[in-house]
Structures are given as C-alpha cells and as structure tokens.
C-alpha cells in the first residue's frame, strides 16, 4: 500500500459536517466514512460505498476536478494543504474493483435499451442491471467509454480501466451492440417495437462547435474532439496554435507535445483559462505556452490572425481591438471550443425534440418528448464533466425504474 495514501488518510479530520462532501462533491460521496473504513483496513466496505454512490468511481478518481470539488472544500486547505482524497479514492476503487460483489436482482422480465456507452450510459446500465432489468447497450463505436475512451488522453485515463468495466458489465449480464448507430436505418421506435420498455439516450456531444471565422475549412485546421479520438493519424507539424482554454484544450496541447510538436500555444480570449488549475499547471510543466486576451480573427494559409482583447472603459468588458491584428504562423490550428450533440436520432425519430441550445429537450424527470425515452449527459447539457454526467444519470435511473414499475409492473417483456 502506498505510504502517501496512508498519510493522506491520517490527515483527515473526520469532520462532523464535512465540507468536502456537502459542498464539494457533486454526488455527495461519504468521504469521511470511506476514509474511516480505509484506516480500519475495511477496504472492500469502503469500495462498496464508493461504487454504490458512483459506479464510475475508478474513473472519477483520476479525471474529476478535485481541486475545486472535494479537495477544494477540505477544511485543512484553508490554512494549508487539503487532504488529497483523489489518491485515497483511486487506491481503494482501483484495488477493489474486481473484488466487488456486483450481483443483480432476479430478472423482472423487462428490457431496457441504453443508447451510448459513455459515462451516463455506463452508469444507467449498471444501476438498472443490478435491479433486474435486461439491459442492452447500443454503441456507435467498437468499444465502450464514449468521451472517456475517445476524448481523454491515455496519460490522464488509461483505456485499460474501461476494458475492465466492459468485462465486469458483461459478467453482470449486460449485452452490447458495438458499431451500431441508432438514427440511421434503425430508430428508437424500432426498439419499442421489439419489446424494450424504456430507452435511455446518452449519445454524448460529438459535433464540434465552429468558430465562425474565415478559413475554418482549410487543410491545416482541426477540431479537438476529432484529434483526441485518434491523434496518431494527424501530422500537426512543429508549431501548433490552439483556440480554446478548457480541459480539452489542455489535453490537445499536451498530446500534441507528446506526438512531437515543439511549439504549442493556447490562445485564451480572457485573462484566465477555463480548465482546472491542475490541468493548466500540468500543461505548463509539459511546455505549453499561453497567450491571454487574444481572439482569433481569421485563419490563413500561413497560420491564424489574432487581435488583442482590451478593456472597454465604459463597460469594463473585454472587446476586440482590430488595430492589433497580427499574423501568427502555425503549421496547424486546433479548435477546442466545446461540442454539441449530433442530430441523427432526431432526424429519424421525429417525436424527439431539441431545445434552443440544440440539445435534447427533457422534462424535470429526464424524460424526452417521446414517451418512455429518457436522456441525460452531454446529449442534454452539452459537454460537461464526467461526475456531472454520473450525478444526472443516477437520478435518471431512478426515474426510469419508477416509470417502468408504474406502467408495466413486473410484466414480462417477452
């Protein structure tokens, strides 16, 4: 057992009103109890609490924005270093994952379709399978994980973790249909026609947002979500300009350096990045450069033209100053300004409606405009964090269970 994990656990004050849990954790992980059990050598019990509360605990321990969540609210952090619960959570959940009892309730005879094997879909599938539903996961790609596999670099989240999830989910009786895209020749109504009682849509947000500037179709311009999917096929060259300042932009920058680019610069519209402090610091350590208060004007063959953003004396807001337009030479220009869902499902199933943001319209129960179809995750909210997807999916699983029990009871779907 790593000594630093034990040391971190010993630093926990076991607060009666834990800020880490109540204010910091989006899914209210019982951090003091987990730490207490860990210190008492009751690892499996600690892991069970983590998994019951967050089926993606292994993943979240690596990719969560801990410095702004649990660790950011730790009382020890007021005057010093917070307890690094991420290290404790990762050690427990990773060490015990294969030993957890994931037995399922007796079958209730009802089939559930889960469209999309990203964070939300995996969470829904695990929760409902354990309650006795026969779950089939439909995934466009060949392997599960969604944004976890195809949007987060290996150095942040090893893909082997997702392979372990796949094996455990198969052991639970969950079925998978890889390379199967709903919204083409097959729609959601076809699932209902085949006896599925409810369908969850968690297809993610894979359509890059455009900048809307001249030159965006040029051959040296790429989108972050596409690049992170398979960086090995890209030849970015030595000098890369990245537009956008979220965690994905940090991932792109650090990946580009690992693939041989020598001069990687992130251009930020404001005076600070949107990425987490940790991800920003890691990018700086890797050699990524940052230019603040810059906005892209247009893309040209030689690179991109940027202007300064200056403060408007009347409003105090930053505005573009085009008198400062400057050409920045770059071999590649990478656009990383978020994503929106694709619309193929909606084009096939006309009962599914989008809201003004271009994401699936749902009610306060997570049900879409199509009866029995629920949705959450990035397909509803746009690109968000993994833990936010898990938190929403947990509630949707409850609502789907309630919907099916009320409408069908224990009637078999056969």
Q: Where in the sequence are the language-model features?
A:
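Residue-level detector of alpha-helix initiation sites
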Residues: 55, 118-119, 143, 246-248, ...
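AMP-binding/adenylate-forming core of the ANL superfamily
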Residues: 199, 303-305, 309, 325-335
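Glycine-rich dinucleotide-binding loop and its adjacent helix/turn
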Residues: 89-106, 164-184, 207-259, 354-369
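N-terminal Rossmann-like FAD-binding beta1-loop-alpha1 element of flavoenzymes
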Residues: 110-135, 250-257
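Rossmann-like dinucleotide-binding cores of NAD(P)H-dependent redox enzymes
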Residues: 134-137, 141-172, 176, 253-298, ...
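FAD-site-proximal beta/loop scaffold in flavoenzymes
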Residues: 217-237, 318-322, 328-383
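A conserved short coil-to-beta-strand element within the FAD-binding core of flavoproteins
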Residues: 178-190, 293-303, 310
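Ferredoxin-type iron-sulfur electron-transfer modules and their immediate structural context
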Residues: 1-111, 159, 196, 201-217, ...
């Amino acid at each position: 057992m790593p000594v630093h994990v034990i040391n971190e656990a010993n630093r926990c004050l076991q607060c009666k009103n834990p800020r880490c849990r109540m204010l910091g954790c989006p899914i209210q992980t019982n951090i003091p109890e987990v730490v207490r059990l860990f210190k008492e050598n009751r690892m499996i019990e600690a892991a069970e609490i983590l998994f019951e509360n967050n089926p993606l605990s292994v993943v979240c321990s690596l990719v969560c924005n801990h410095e702004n969540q649990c660790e950011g609210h730790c009382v020890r952090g007021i005057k010093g270093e917070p307890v690094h619960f991420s290290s404790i959570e990762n050690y427990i959940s990773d060490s015990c994952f294969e030993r957890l009892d994931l037995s399922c309730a007796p079958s209730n005879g009802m089939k559930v379709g889960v469209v999309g094997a990203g964070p939300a879909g995996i969470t829904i599938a695990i929760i409902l399978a354990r309650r006795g539903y026969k779950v089939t996961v439909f995934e466009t790609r060949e392997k599960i994980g969604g944004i976890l596999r195809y949007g987060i670099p290996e150095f942040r989240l090893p893909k082997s973790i997702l392979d372990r999830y796949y094996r455990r989910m198969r052991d639970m009786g969950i079925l998978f249909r890889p390379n199967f895209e709903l919204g083409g020749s097959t729609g959601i109504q076809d699932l209902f026609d085949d006896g599925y009682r409810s369908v969850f849509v968690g297809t993610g947000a894979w359509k890059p947002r455009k900048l809307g500037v001249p030159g965006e179709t040029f051959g040296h311009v790429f989108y972050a979500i596409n690049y992170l999917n398979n960086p090995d096929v890209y030849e970015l060259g030595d000098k890369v300009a990245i537009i956008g300042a979220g965690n994905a932009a940090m991932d792109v920058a650090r990946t580009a350096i690992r693939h041989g680019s020598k001069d990687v610069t992130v251009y930020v519209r404001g005076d600070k990045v949107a990425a987490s402090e940790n991800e920003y610091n890691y990018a700086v350590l890797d050699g990524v450069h940052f230019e603040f208060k810059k906005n892209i004007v247009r893309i040209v063959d030689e690179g991109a033209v940027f202007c300064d953003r200056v403060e408007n004396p009347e409003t105090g807001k930053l505005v573009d100053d085009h008198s400062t337009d400057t050409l920045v030479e770059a071999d590649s220009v990478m656009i990383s300004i978020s994503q929106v869902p694709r619309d193929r499902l909606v084009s096939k199933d006309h009962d599914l409606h989008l809201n003004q943001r271009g994401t699936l319209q749902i009610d306060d129960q997570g049900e879409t405009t199509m009866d029995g179809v629920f949705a959450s995750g990035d397909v509803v909210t746009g690109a968000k964090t993994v833990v936010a997807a898990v938190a929403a999916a947990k509630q949707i699983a409850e609502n789907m269970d309630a919907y099916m029990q009320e409408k069908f009871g224990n009637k078999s779907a056969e």
